[in-house]
Every structure is written in C-alpha cells, then in structure tokens.
C-alpha cells in the first residue's frame, strides 16, 4: 500500500474521530447551557459570561502563540530531529509560563479595577463576580499549561485520544451542571470552582498521556534565543487575526454588559454556544489534515504537501 493511501486513510480516520467528538460535545454543551441557565438564573448566568469573557480577551495572545507551537512541533516532528523536538516543546512551555505571569499581572492590576468600577453587576453579586474573575483566571492558566501537550497530541495524530479526553471533559461539565442544581453554597461560585477543577483534571490527563507516549514531552529548562524569536515571529502573523476576532466577540460582550446589563450577556452567551458549535465543522477537518501537510513539507515531500492542500480545499 502506498504512503499516499496510508495517509489518506489516517486523515479519514482522524476526521471521523474529531467529528464524533464534535457532535457529542455540541449536543452536551447545548444541553449543559440549558441546565446551567436554569441553575444560575438569568442574571448570574449573564455575570458569568461577562466576567469570564473578560478573561477570554487575554487569550488573543495565547491563541496566536498556540498556533505557532502547534506548527513548530509538527514541523520538527516531520524532520525527525528528536533533540530539537524536545527543545521546541520546552521553549513552548517557557513561553506559556511567561504569558501566564503577564496575564496574572494585567488581570490583578487592571481587571479587578475594571470589574468593580465599570462593569454592570447586580447589587450584592460583586463578591461572587470577583470569585468568578479569579477562578476564570486560574482556569485560563491551566489551559495555557496544556497547550504544548495538546499540540504534541495533534502533531502525532492521536485524534482518538484527543476525542476521548474531550468527551470526558464534556461529560464532566454536564455533571457539574447537574451538581449545582442542588448546591448548598453560592451557586455561581460553586459552578465556576467546579469548572476550574474539571479544567485541572483534564489538563493532568493530557500531561500524563503525552509524557507516557511521547519522549519529547519532558520539560527541560533550556532557552534557545533564536528559536524563541522565530516562534514569536511566526505567532505575530497569527496575532493579527486572533486579536480582531477576539476583540469583536469579547469586546462586544463587555460593551453589552456595560450598557445593557447581565441579562443581555446571558442571551448572547447562549447564542455564542450555537455559533461556536457550527464553526467547528470545518475546523475539525482542518485539524485532521494540517499535521500531514506540515510534516510532508518538513520532510521535503513538497509534491505530497501541495497535493494535500489541494485535496483538502
């Protein structure tokens, strides 16, 4: 069997696994939103979407860097240079640590002030809103930590593991939604704390799986200035697209909160769930085929790389 035929079968299998994951998560997330809205109420659900959306604005930096990390890990994997692969992975983790420190400083210095002076929060819910801010920040850091591991998983085309872990995370989120229906504590704080716990457990699973299966996923404190500069240079182009999209989505969310209140945020939060689910249809196929394109190019199989680009368009 030719390499092209094997690659085509792998892409088809990976695409199928990603679509199974997507369909499951789409159904679960839409139902979870309904249960969470019922448990929190319109105002608290709106507060959650507005405050957590404020933290999501900082992901414009991490999103562009994540694309660079994924590209570099996949490219070096295609070259077959194991030593450089570990260097890329370790450099990626150092970059994520630096971003995490920067975001924490910005949120604690600016975010807390903005929340308590400019955002529209119902009377008596400022304490809960501040808890949401801090726990959403912690969840954001957990997600940053897992980015190089996720990139390695996709670069090695282990889409079945990626799908199963995603299904676990979606199921856990649904479990959290049912738990808060009978919460003895402040429902909003309890919900965000449990979501933070789910994020932590999921990231630990990603880390353990990658360390056991991929030799490059062992962190070593190495700093390659040239590689660091190259990764940030590549990320700069992704940053242009990321910042425009995220400012449009999350900036509107904050403006809605300031001028119309949390009830409008609740409605927009539900609409965003549907919009995100639909957008993932094309994204999943691209996720399945991108590693093959990058690895073919890295190994100087330019014709195969061009062929994959044309056939996947």
What positions do the PLM features span?
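Hydrophobic alpha-helical transmembrane segments
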Residues: 21, 134, 163-213, 233-234, ...
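Interfacial transmembrane-helix starts/ends
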Residues: 11-12, 49, 83-98, 232, ...
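Short membrane-interface helical motifs at transmembrane helix boundaries
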Residues: 104-124
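Helix-loop junctions and terminal segments of transmembrane helices
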Residues: 63-79, 155, 214-215, 275-313
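Residue-level recognition of pore/gate-forming positions within transmembrane alpha-helices
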Residues: 22, 26, 53-56, 91, ...
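Signature of the first transmembrane helix
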Residues: 10-75, 104-108, 173-174, 233-263
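Alpha-helical transmembrane segments of polytopic membrane transporters and translocases
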Residues: 46-62, 91-94, 194, 201, ...
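Interhelical loop/hinge segments that connect adjacent transmembrane helices in multipass membrane
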Residues: 1-11, 188-192, 206-250, 288, ...
């Amino acid at each position: 069997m030719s390499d092209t035929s094997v690659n085509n079968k792998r892409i088809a299998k990976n695409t199928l696994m990603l679509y199974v994951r997507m369909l499951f998560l789409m159904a679960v997330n839409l139902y979870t939103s309904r249960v969470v809205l019922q448990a929190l109420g319109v105002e608290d659900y709106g507060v959650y979407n507005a405050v957590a959306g404020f933290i999501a604005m900082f992901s414009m930096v991490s999103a562009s860097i994540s694309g660079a990390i994924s590209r570099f890990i996949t490219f070096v994997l295609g070259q077959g240079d194991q030593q450089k692969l570990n260097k890329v992975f370790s450099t990626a983790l150092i970059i994520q640590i630096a971003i995490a420190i920067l975001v924490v400083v910005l949120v604690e210095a600016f975010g807390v002030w903005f929340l308590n002076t400019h955002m529209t929060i119902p009377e008596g819910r400022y304490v809960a809103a501040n808890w949401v801010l801090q726990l959403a920040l912690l969840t954001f850091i957990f997600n940053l930590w897992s980015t190089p591991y996720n990139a390695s998983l996709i670069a090695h085309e282990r889409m079945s593991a990626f799908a199963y872990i995603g299904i676990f995370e979606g199921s856990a989120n649904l479990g959290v939604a049912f738990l808060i229906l009978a919460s003895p504590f402040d429902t909003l704080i309890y919900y965000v704390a449990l979501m933070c716990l789910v994020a932590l457990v999921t990231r630990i699973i990603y880390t353990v799986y990658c360390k056991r299966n991929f030799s490059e996923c062992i962190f070593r404190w190495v700093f390659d200035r040239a590689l660091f500069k190259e990764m940030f240079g590549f990320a700069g182009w992704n940053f242009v697209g990321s910042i425009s999209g995220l400012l449009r989505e999350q900036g509107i969310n904050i403006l809605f909160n300031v001028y119309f209140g949390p009830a409008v945020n609740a409605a927009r939060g539900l609409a965003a769930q549907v919009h995100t689910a639909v957008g993932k249809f094309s994204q999943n196929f691209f996720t399945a085929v991108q590693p093959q394109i990058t690895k073919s190019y890295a190994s100087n199989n330019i014709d195969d790389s061009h062929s994959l680009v044309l056939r996947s368009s």
